[in-house]
From Swiss-Prot:
It comes from Chlorobium limicola (strain DSM 245 / NBRC 103803 / 6330). Monomer. ATP binds at K203, G294, E325, G354, G355, D356, S357. GO terms for biological process: gluconeogenesis; glycolytic process. It is found in: Cytoplasm. The gene is pgk. Pathway: Carbohydrate degradation; glycolysis; pyruvate from D-glyceraldehyde 3-phosphate: step 2/5. PROSITE patterns: PGLYCERATE_KINASE (PS00111). This is Phosphoglycerate kinase. It comes from the Bacteria.
Length: 397
């Protein structure tokens, strides 16, 4: 997917309208608890400012349901960006309208304005053409650097590209496409994928697409119990998707047919309930007692999965191995994170597909030891499913 990027255009004196993903978590006092998404947009932002562009930033934050709500204002993001850049960032009162247009036209080279939350208008998520056109009129060049929303055809990501001549990718999207794209198109082998999370249903398309690309798949998280039950094993009170048992068997058969090594856990950590003070122990997967719940992969599985990861040249991970929100049941997930960091040090390319896995790696303090951590949970999943992302497809080739 070769798309034009920021590096391909001249910016000097131009109004550059950039879609960023500043959907950051806020606490009750409206303080940003994690500014990772703002920091990740800095390379594109700095490039535009340093090259004399007039930068207009737009983003959504949370789910304000199509009407103005100060709880979802982007003011904290503008303030944090101003600190990071050490220069003023003007905060607009809206994202469209006469007043905003006047503020935008008054910008000088190298100045920055942050538009208010796009989702204060229902037209954003409806991909309304008039709204998209009004947004487009603010800039002369459009840049999309919001990978996290690239799988959504919204006014600011897809509709807008019909009303601008120049629509290019920012550095963050370029990096995402480079790592995720290379992993799917021409990975160094062996290529190992690790999939976790609670449900098979959310990962079917990913699994089926990866079966055409990878050498080995390691499965963890609660979705293993649907596989176990399908194979006739007892699963106690663990989470099982009863309507996905046949599907689980067909996935096992597909893997065998395509000569893919599909590994399921050999042992499981079980507890009577999912709580931090529950008694827990490791048991073999064919010995899960009635009434017990599987909460993590066991030590033998951790060791086996580690070996597979260390033997790989490309590793892709999406989804935790257990209930990692509880420290005692996070050991399996942390073990995967550590194995990935060690594989990276040994020269492998390691990629984390956003969401919970990214949070787990951050929790383990290993984020800087992974080749690439995707910024888009849903977007990276759809990319791994082999789907075209509308926000990227719409950019200039």
């Amino acid at each position: 997917m070769q798309k034009k990027t920021l590096s391909d255009i001249t910016i000097q004196g131009k109004r550059v309208l950039m879609r960023v993903d500043f959907n950051v978590p806020l606490d009750e006092e409206k303080n940003i608890t994690d500014d990772k998404r703002i920091v990740e947009a800095l390379p594109s932002i700095k490039k535009i400012i340093e090259n004399g562009g007039r930068l207009i930033l737009m983003s959504h934050l949370g789910r304000p349901k199509g009407k103005p709500n100060q709880d979802f204002s982007l003011t904290p993001a503008a303030e944090r960006l101003s600190e990071l850049l050490d220069c003023p960032v003007i905060m607009a009162g809206d994202c469209i309208g006469t007043e905003v247009m006047q503020q935008v036209l008054a910008l000088q080279d190298g100045e920055v304005i942050m538009l208010e939350n796009l989702r204060f208008h229902p037209e954003e998520e409806a991909n309304d053409p008039d709204f998209a056109k009004e947004l487009a009129s603010l800039g002369e060049i459009y840049v999309n650097d919001a990978f996290g929303t690239a799988h959504r055809a919204h006014a600011s990501t897809e509709g807008i590209t019909r009303y601008v001549q120049t629509a290019v990718a920012g550095y963050l999207i370029e990096k995402e496409l480079m790592y995720l794209g290379k992993a799917l198109q021409e990975p160094e082998r062996p290529f190992v994928a690790i999939l976790g999370g609670s449900k098979i249903s959310g990962k079917i398309d990913v699994l089926e697409n990866l079966f055409n690309k990878v050498d080995t798949v390691l499965i963890g998280g609660a979705m293993v119990f649907t596989f176990f039950k399908a194979q006739g094993l007892g699963t106690g009170n663990s989470l099982v998707e009863e309507n996905k048992l046949e599907l689980a068997l067909s996935l096992i058969e597909q893997a065998a047919r395509k000569n893919i090594k599909l590994l399921l856990p050999q042992d499981i950590i079980i507890a009577p309930e999912i709580s931090a003070d529950a008694e827990s122990m490791a048991v073999a997967v064919n010995a899960i007692p009635d009434g017990m719940i599987g909460v993590d992969i066991g030590p033998e599985t951790r060791a086996a999965y580690r070996q597979e990861i260390l033997g790989a040249r490309t590793v892709l991970w999406n989804g935790p191995m257990g209930v990692f929100e509880i420290d005692r049941f996070a050991e399996g997930t942390i073990a995967i994170a550590e194995a990935m960091a060690d594989a990276t040090a040994a020269g492998a390319t390691t990629i984390i597909g956003g969401g919970d896995s990214a949070a787990a790696v951050a929790k383990a303090g290993l984020a800087d030891q992974i080749t690439h951590i995707s910024t888009g949970g849903g977007a990276s999943l759809e990319f791994l499913e082999g789907k075209e992302l509308p926000g990227i497809a719409a950019l200039n080739d």
